[in-house]
Curated annotation (Swiss-Prot):
The gene is frr. Keywords: Cytoplasm, Protein biosynthesis. GO terms for cellular component: cytosol. GO terms for molecular function: ribosomal large subunit binding. This is Ribosome-recycling factor.
Length: 185
């Protein structure tokens, strides 16, 4: 039973870490990354469709993304979707390819982005601590139902804490890497 709780805890913490990585990968660093445009929805036959389903996005160089639209009739809709997104990008089309130059980040904008990254990191740590609390509650319930001894409860909580510490450390590493990425460019 305790092993199931530990496995579930680890799985949930891993999902929290992956969610954090996904969130902060969308934060623009000044370096062209195709994932930057992942959140963009294009109006396609009356419904919002993810850009990834309508076009191929590649990094042309360090400061330019190339969006190769599969259906030429959608070029203006894709261009409009990129322009109206909150990313502050100014696309230009050349044939079937839309080029999206990334403006350099100002020092002030970098500081703002670092604050956002730290906030996302704190949310990730909170999610991990909530998972720990749930696991500890499950362990206490086992003790209350007399399915485990107090020694087993203490040992299990210590193991859960070690898992938690490991994931909090991973969150810190992800944040440090993103901050370095924001400051280095």
């Amino acid at each position: 039973m305790i092993n199931e709780i530990k496995k579930d805890t680890q799985d949930r913490m891993e999902k929290s870490l992956e969610a954090l990585k996904s969130h902060i990968s969308k934060i623009r660093t000044g370096r062209a990354q195709p994932s930057l445009l992942d959140g963009i929805q294009v109006e396609y036959y009356g419904s919002a469709t993810p850009l990834r389903q309508l076009a191929n996005v590649v990094a042309e160089d360090a400061r330019t993304l190339a969006v190769n639209v599969f259906d030429r009739s959608l070029i203006s809709a894709v261009e409009k979707a990129i322009l109206t997104s909150d990313l502050g990008l100014n696309p230009s089309s050349a044939g079937a390819t839309i080029r999206v130059p990334l403006p350099p980040l100002t020092e002030e904008r970098r500081r703002d982005l670092i604050k956002i990254v730290k906030g996302e990191g704190e949310q990730g740590k909170i999610a991990i601590r909530n998972v720990r609390r749930d696991a500890n509650d499950q362990i206490k319930a086992l003790l209350k139902d007399k399915e485990i001894s107090e020694d087993e409860e203490r040992k299990a909580q210590d193991e859960i804490q070690k898992i938690t510490d490991g994931y909090v450390k991973k969150v810190d590493e992800v944040l440090a890497a993103k901050e370095k990425e924001l400051l280095d460019f």
